Amino acid sequence: MAALRRLLWPPPRLSPTLAPQQPFLSPWGRPAGTAPGMSGRPFSGREEDEGAVAEAAWRRRRWGELSIAAAAGGGLVGLVCYQLYGDPRADPSELVAPELDESPRGRGLLPIPVAAAKETVATGRAVTEDLDLYATSRERRFRLFASIECEGQLFMTPYDFILAVTTDEPKFAKTWKSLSKQELSQMLSETPPVWKGSSKLFRNLKERGVISYTEYLFLLCILTKPHAGFRIAFNMFDTDGNEMVDKKEFLVLQEIFRKKNEKRETKGDEEKRAMLRLQLYGYHSPTNSVLKPDAEELVSRSYWDTLRRSTSQALFSDLAERADDITSLVADTTLLVHFFGKKGKAELNFEDFYRFMDNLQTEVLEIEFLSYSNGMNTISEEDFAHILLRYTNVENTSVFLENVRYSIPEEKGITFDEFRSFFQFLNNLEDFAIALNMYNFASRSIGQDEFKRAVYVATGLKLSPHLVNTVFKIFDVDKDDQLSYKEFIGIMKDRLHRGFRGYKTVQKYPTFKSCLKKELHSR
């Protein structure tokens, strides 16, 4: 305000009572009543007119400076607002790019590339928003992240799937981009064959592909299963035992997952539930299901257990008679083209199937690691704790994070190899729990050496001493350097089911942007 006052107020005139030897200094730092550049001598007559002209020019120059400053300030405010709220037309695929835009030096890891899907007619969600009332939590999550609609059926892109398993929720509501059959076929033509797969498949495809709801559930199963379970999954699809799986055999999971959802449907408006089934499966439920009614209707099972228990029943039912009907009803997807070729005639062997499942697990872990590594080859022990606690039901994570800060004051870092080995161990958590219960039989906890030994016996994995020490520092709440079932297994079971349970919103570190946004909303 003082600067503005100096700019706007005219310079005071020289008082006649002041002697020339003691001039009165004006706000501009020169004797009042003198023109700029003059020696401080009072003026009168013509000199006074010239001084007035000079002072007017001086004021005009000051007004110009003020205008420039105001324009610069306005530009700065506009930039801050743009950074806060973004372009309202921004593509949803760009929303999480800042979190995943770095890759560690010296590694082959890549973040999710940001690429917009082909622009088509956008379909608003308002018309079908009330369908969430009839959907399960998994169905709602799929609909939340799906961005493609073709003939009434919703699909995720490979990019959508990565976001669904690595972020808590979309930062902005998406619109479903409507594709015709021809556009979908053109998109799928870019799908590589299975023998060209890699741990960057989903990031390379970006938004040039589609994943159905049943495939989404199947991929979530893969993410939480040990490598030993890959053979079980393959054998479940191999109906004739020839060590090969064809497209018709693979499509049995479509019927299995659909039937499981029918049991859990919310009673209500039949028209709305039919519309929801059309969105998720692309067709209405057939009158004669491939699967027979389950006698244990009230027993809640995971999708993996349902797949394992129901496949044998489906394989010896009327599937062979209806296989062609099911194939004609199911739209081609990226996964089907990747496994069985563009014509659907190729067959999938176990080696390619195993490689695909292993690559998917690796890709998701790479993306999670990169979101915290900031271009480095390691993440901090505290960031490792953040990732472990991310999808758990722990209400107060600050206790665990404080344990890490206090117990490991000097950061050493967790490498990607250590990071990956730990999550491979988590996928074997059930076997490890059996071993841990043996130690815990007499209500005793275990130390680090016993923990490493139990992990190796149950999973065959050797965890590094630093990784084991970090895990103990995170979960050893009572600081006795011992680990119990309650301190570890109970929490990690929540983490293991990352895709099947509700996502816990994680508090992010406060930033200038969040503080400023909060202040603007409060006014």
Swiss-Prot record:
Residues 225-260, 414-429, 463-498 form the EF-hand domain. Ca(2+) 2 binds at D476, D478, D480, Q482, E487. GO terms for cellular component: mitochondrial intermembrane space; mitochondrion; uniplex complex. Ca(2+) 1 binds at D238, D240, N242, M244, D246, E249. Residues 18-48 are annotated as: Disordered. Residues 1-6 form a transit peptide. GO terms for molecular function: calcium channel regulator activity; calcium ion binding; calcium ion sensor activity; protein heterodimerization activity. Keywords: Calcium, Disulfide bond, Membrane, Metal-binding, Mitochondrion, Mitochondrion inner membrane, Repeat, Transit peptide. Tissue-specific calcium sensor of the mitochondrial calcium uniporter (MCU) channel, which specifically regulates MCU channel activity in the central nervous system and skeletal muscle. Senses calcium level via its EF-hand domains: compared to MICU1 and MICU2, MICU3 has a higher affinity for calcium. MICU1 and MICU3 form a disulfide-linked heterodimer that stimulates and inhibits MCU activity, depending on the concentration of calcium. At low calcium levels, MICU1 occludes the pore of the MCU channel, preventing mitochondrial calcium uptake. This is Calcium uptake protein 3, mitochondrial.
